From Swiss-Prot:
Species of provenance: Chromohalobacter salexigens (strain ATCC BAA-138 / DSM 3043 / CIP 106854 / NCIMB 13768 / 1H11)
Main location group: cytoplasm
Subcellular location as annotated: Cytoplasm; Secreted; Cell surface
Top-level taxon in the UniProt lineage: Bacteria
Pathway: Carbohydrate degradation; glycolysis; pyruvate from D-glyceraldehyde 3-phosphate: step 4/5
Residues at the active site: 209, 341
Enzyme Commission identifier(s): 4.2.1.11
Binding-site residues for (2R)-2-phosphoglycerate, renumbered to this chain: 167, 341, 370-371, 392
UniProt name for this protein: Enolase
Key words, A-Z: Cytoplasm, Glycolysis, Lyase, Magnesium, Metal-binding, Secreted
GO cellular component terms given for this protein: cell surface; extracellular region; phosphopyruvate hydratase complex
NCBIfam families per the UniProt record, alphabetical: eno
């Protein structure tokens, strides 16, 4: 037994300068696990509740002292003396203590920080890397897989102050032989893109996730400048590198219309499906996240019927890492992949359940950061520990993003060739 001796929390800052919760779980052996909760900008309406203070005299109302108090009080009282190795029992105890469907009682940010800190403490107690401990919790056996990164090198939407409607334009170095080489390819393309933008007299400032955020005439132009950057870096688009989008469509969906204000165009669901299909015909786009609004299930059905056999269709705001909603998607053949974000559901155990349900149904699971991140690198270990095969953790700058990539480099080196880099085979519809 790895007895929990103490738990305490602290209000710290995330990468956007907003408060978040950091928790420490201390074991009787003296081992300490520390974790921070991330925070999103474009959020699904069904996500677990992030508890904020609402006190406008502090941090513009975004303080998390209530969540910190929940950790230092009720959560600590409930978990001290329990076994950190029994992750599911710890998470269940916190969910019972919270007593709500959306974690409004204690706050998903409070519960998650403790859940992850406990897992880290347990891994240290066992003397194994965190990814190995997560693999044990998940029931993962056999060869590990390193994740193919979705690198968000050009930002729009809620992640940038520009006129581009689609939120993320990403590259996937599928032709690389290893994660290390994939990271190198991505970095070289990132630097090439900066030169391409500068040559056009466009902004090379970056958005929340480290991607460039220039004003462009259309979403298609964003893809065109990325293609130019890929070629400038010496790679072949569609062979060495493929493209992925996060439309974050809920951010521009209103009254049944998809409004691309940057292009001055508006589409109904059928029209927007055709718009996305046309982009896929023009460019090697192999993955689209949140192609339709989170409430537009009919639109999602049409998108899946149109593109689902050849494009990975990832539900983020649609599924919010929630097994109940994911099951509906599986049953109704909506999408074919789920984005996994710890804080959408609020505990490690529930996150693992969502990955398991997806993989058992033949869906892929893409492990993801949030736009508001910290130096915490747990998602890197989660991606390897569950052999998810894909990770989305931003661009090739900003230390809150690069920290995850650097952690994956360490993991790959530790595994010394025991972990395969799956390339295109990791992406639904491409293997």
């Amino acid at each position: 037994m790895a007895e929990i001796k103490d738990i305490h929390a602290l209000e710290v800052l995330d990468s956007r300068g907003n408060p978040t919760v950091q928790a420490d779980v201390v074991l009787a052996s003296g081992v300490r696990g520390t974790a921070c909760a991330p925070s999103g900008a474009s959020t699904g309406s069904r996500e677990a509740l992030e508890l904020r203070d609402g006190d406008t005299s502090r941090y513009l109302g975004k303080g998390v002292l209530k969540a910190v108090e929940a950790v230092n009080g009720r959560i600590r009282d409930a978990l001290v003396g329990k076994d950190a190795l029994d992750q599911r029992a710890l998470d269940a105890a916190m969910l019972e203590l919270d007593g709500t469907d959306n974690k409004a009682g204690l706050g998903a940010n409070a519960i998650l920080a403790v859940s992850l800190a406990a897992a880290k403490a347990a891994a240290i107690e066992k003397g194994v890397p965190l990814y190995a401990h997560i693999a044990d919790l998940y029931g993962q056996s056999g060869q590990f897989r390193m994740p193919v990164p979705m690198m968000n090198i050009l930002n729009g939407g809620e992640h940038a102050d520009n006129n581009v409607d689609i939120q993320e334009f990403m590259i996937q170095p599928v032709g690389a032989p290893s994660f290390r080489e994939a990271l190198r390819m991505g970095a070289e393309i990132f630097h090439a893109l900066k030169k391409v933008l500068a040559a056009r007299g466009l902004s090379t400032s970056v958005g929340d996730e480290g991607g460039f955020a220039p004003n462009l005439a259309s979403n298609a132009e964003a893809l065109a400048v990325i293609q130019q950057a890929v070629e400038k870096a010496g790679y072949v688009l569609g062979k060495d590198v493929t493209l992925a989008l996060d439309c974050a469509s809920s951010e521009f969906y209103q009254d049944g219309q998809y409004n691309l204000s940057g292009e001055g165009k508006s589409y109904d669901a059928a029209g927007f499906v055709d718009y996305l299909a046309a982009l896929c015909d023009q460019y090697p786009i192999v993955s689209i996240e949140d192609g339709m609004d989170e409430s537009d299930w009919a639109g999602w059905k049409a998108l899946t019927e149109k593109l689902g056999d050849k494009v990975q269709l990832v539900g983020d705001d649609l599924f919010v890492t929630n097994t109940r909603i994911l099951k509906r998607g599986i049953d109704e053949h909506i999408g074919n992949s789920i984005l996994i974000k710890f804080n959408q559901i609020g505990s490690l155990s529930e996150t693992l359940d969502a990955i398991k349900m997806a993989q058992d149904a033949g869906f892929t699971a893409v492990i993801s950061h949030r736009s508001g991140e910290t130096e915490d690198t747990t998602i890197a270990d989660l991606a390897v520990g569950t052999s998810a095969g894909q990770i989305k953790t931003g661009s090739l700058c900003r230390s809150d993003r690069v920290a995850k990539y650097n952690r994956l480099l360490v993991i790959e080196q530790e595994l010394e060739g025991q972990a395969v880099y799956p390339g295109l085979a990791a992406i639904k519809g491409q293997g």
